[in-house]
């Protein structure tokens, strides 16, 4: 995917800004940040007023790029940074942007086949990180999320996220 002779994986992170480039205006050394997984060249219609996730230059940091988060220091674009939510731990802060971006891309990233109000969506693993984001995106978009869980004690959590219904997969012998 890239031509560098090395690869540092990892697409989700939170941390403290250690250094900034000369053109960076919004961030300074010492800022506590969350790093979003999207990188792009910033020079097309989708990056400038559209949806950068649909940019032809869009790539996932640490997966399609050589420099990811599994390092002591990570190199990112300034537009990848978000202020770290103070009510979340460092670990909690690090994990939500990747699963949110992944769920968003699954539901809205295949034009013209995108999620619309009234659509029914089966969300397998609805109580996990990716599934819980998918349920919330469905609810926010007016779609009907039906969550699939593996334990009955997860039902209420998924319903509180906005699911219209929940199926416990252990109540069924066959999904074929």
Regions found by a protein language model. Give the residues of each.
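Glycine-rich beta-strand-centered segment in the early N-terminal region that forms part
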Residues: 1-48, 67, 80, 85-88
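Phosphate-binding beta-alpha-beta segment of Rossmann-like dinucleotide-binding domains, i.e.
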Residues: 40-67, 114
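A glycine-rich, Thr/Ser-enriched phosphate-binding loop motif common to dinucleotide/cofactor-binding enzymes
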Residues: 64-70, 86-111, 124-127, 133
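A short glycine-rich beta-alpha junction/loop motif
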Residues: 73-81
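Phosphate-coordination loops involved in phosphoryl transfer and adenosine-cofactor binding
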Residues: 117-119
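Adenosine-nucleotide cofactor-binding segment
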Residues: 123, 139-176
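Surface-exposed amphipathic alpha-helices with a cationic face
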Residues: 132-140
């Amino acid at each position: 995917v890239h031509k560098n002779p090395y690869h540092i994986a990892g697409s989700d992170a939170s941390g403290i800004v250690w250094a900034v480039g000369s053109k960076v205006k919004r961030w300074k050394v010492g800022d506590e940040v969350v790093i979003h997984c999207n990188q792009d060249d910033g020079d097309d219609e989708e990056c400038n007023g559209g949806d950068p996730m649909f940019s032809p230059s869009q790539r996932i940091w640490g997966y399609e790029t050589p420099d990811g988060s599994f390092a002591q220091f990570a190199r990112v674009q300034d537009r990848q940074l978000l202020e770290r939510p103070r009510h979340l731990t460092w670990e909690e802060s690090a994990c939500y942007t990747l699963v949110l971006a992944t769920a968003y891309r699954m539901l809205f990233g295949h034009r013209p086949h995108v999620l619309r109000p009234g659509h029914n969506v089966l969300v397998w693993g609805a109580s996990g990180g990716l599934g819980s984001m998918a349920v919330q995106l469905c609810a926010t978009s007016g779609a009907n999320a039906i969550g699939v869980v593996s334990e009955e004690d997860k039902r209420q959590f998924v319903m509180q996220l906005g699911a219209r219904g929940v199926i416990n997969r252990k109540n069924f012998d066959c999904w074929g």
